């Protein structure tokens, strides 16, 4: 019985050691990658100066063209991310402050997102590789239910968000495979023709107090 318990303890210790090693390896890869997403680009940049910065979801990502502003002499970047909510754009703005960005004008997309305090799991996952390195990210997520697990259990955050920051994404980051998200200064036009407009009655909607929106105003 003692031998069996000792064997189990060895297995647990081995698994813990493997998790620690994997956590370190994945983290090193991500903190040295700046060409896969707008979040890793933001994390690995500092002291940027812009005349105009766009923040928001696909409505920003697919529609605001920095080149048009650049032609008028305004240094511009589109930090919009498809599927992001106000919570994620608030954290982007905080990271810009943390990275000592100097921005003259910020255009924030609000629209119907003001009516929900929800978040995007897909976009939240993109911040997780830097949870240990960024005090700003830790402070932003300290109240979410899974925070302690994500912070304290080795490799847990990479397993929890495997679909977005798992092995495949880590491998592409390690070999320096770029995506197109940073092309055109962050502007990503829709490739296909837009479908028909969907009729919607917006009269039932009205602005509500949004925690992330208030958070963004306090940063600005």
What is the meaning of each model-derived region?
Residues 27-49:
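Alpha-helical transmembrane signal-anchor/signal-peptide segments
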Residues 123-220:
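Secreted/periplasmic serine-hydrolase-like ester/acetyl group-modifying domain
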Residues 6-26:
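Hydrophobic membrane-insertion alpha-helices, especially the h-region
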Residues 55, 59-147:
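Membrane-embedded segments
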Residues 1-2:
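N-terminal hydrophobic targeting signals that begin at the initiator methionine
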Residues 22-29, 75-83, 204-214:
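Acidic/glycine-enriched edge-of-secondary-structure segments
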Residues 34, 85-88, 215-216:
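Soluble or luminal CAZymes and related metallo-dependent hydrolases
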């Amino acid at each position: 019985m003692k031998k069996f318990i000792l064997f189990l303890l060895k297995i647990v210790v081995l698994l813990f050691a493997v998790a620690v090693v994997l956590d370190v390896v994945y983290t090193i890869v991500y903190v040295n990658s700046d060409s896969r997403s707008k979040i890793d680009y933001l994390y690995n940049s500092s002291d940027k100066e812009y005349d105009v910065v766009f923040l928001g979801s696909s409505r920003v990502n697919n529609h605001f063209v920095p080149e048009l502003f650049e032609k008028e002499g305004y240094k511009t970047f589109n930090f919009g991310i498809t599927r992001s909510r106000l919570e994620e754009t608030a954290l982007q703005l905080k990271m810009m402050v943390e990275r000592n960005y100097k921005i003259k004008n910020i255009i924030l997309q609000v629209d119907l997102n003001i009516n929900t305090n929800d978040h995007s799991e897909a976009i939240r996952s993109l911040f997780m590789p830097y949870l240990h390195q960024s005090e700003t990210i830790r402070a932003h997520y300290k109240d979410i239910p899974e925070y302690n697990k994500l912070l304290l259990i080795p490799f847990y955050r990479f397993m929890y968000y495997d679909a977005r920051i798992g092995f495949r994404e880590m491998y592409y980051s390690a070999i320096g495979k770029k995506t197109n998200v940073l092309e055109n200064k962050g502007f990503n036009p829709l490739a296909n023709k837009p479908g028909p407009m969907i009729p919607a009655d917006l009269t039932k909607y009205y602005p509500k107090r949004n925690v992330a929106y208030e958070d963004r105003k306090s940063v600005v």
